[in-house]
Amino acid sequence: MAAFENFLNVGQSLYNELKNICVWVKSNGGGMGSLYRSRHEMVCVFKIGKAPHINNVKLGKNGRNRTNVWEYPGVRANTPDSLELLKLHPTSKPVALLYDALLDASNINDIVLDCFGGSGSTLIAATRCKRRARIIEISPHYCDIILWRWEKETGKKASFVKNIGENSNEQ
């Protein structure tokens, strides 16, 4: 729990407002652990800037009936798709979870930032819901995996640039 508190404190020092803490309940069981296997992960939803936050849920007005408890299968070795993701990265997140979160709190062509790119699930989700993603990943190996997944998803070839300008519509 101390790690989550540290994460929350850092988030609160960087962002303007904590909008909610969501709980991802892994509907297919727990992940790693020792005494008790954790079947959930905490997701902090922060807002930055002075503009009103984006709320595409609107209490179900548009058919998006959402709560702060999100039930999605965890990525485990018991399905072919999950096994492929686990081979790429040990803590891959389901694209469907990220896709729904992006639909909830962003609009088409908005920029989405993921500072821990990992296996690239955020980039895939952003591509599917027409958001522009900015992904940061420290490991060159995982950067290659992210690019490979994006190329597989889009059928396009990634190109390397030194600087992506503010007006760019590239992923």
Task: Label each region the model flagged.
Residues H141-K152, K156:
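Short alpha-helix adjacent to the SAM-binding motif of class I
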Residues S38-C44, E153-F160:
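Short, structured secondary-structure boundary patches
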Residues M42, I146, N167-S168:
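Short, intrinsically disordered/low-complexity patches at protein termini
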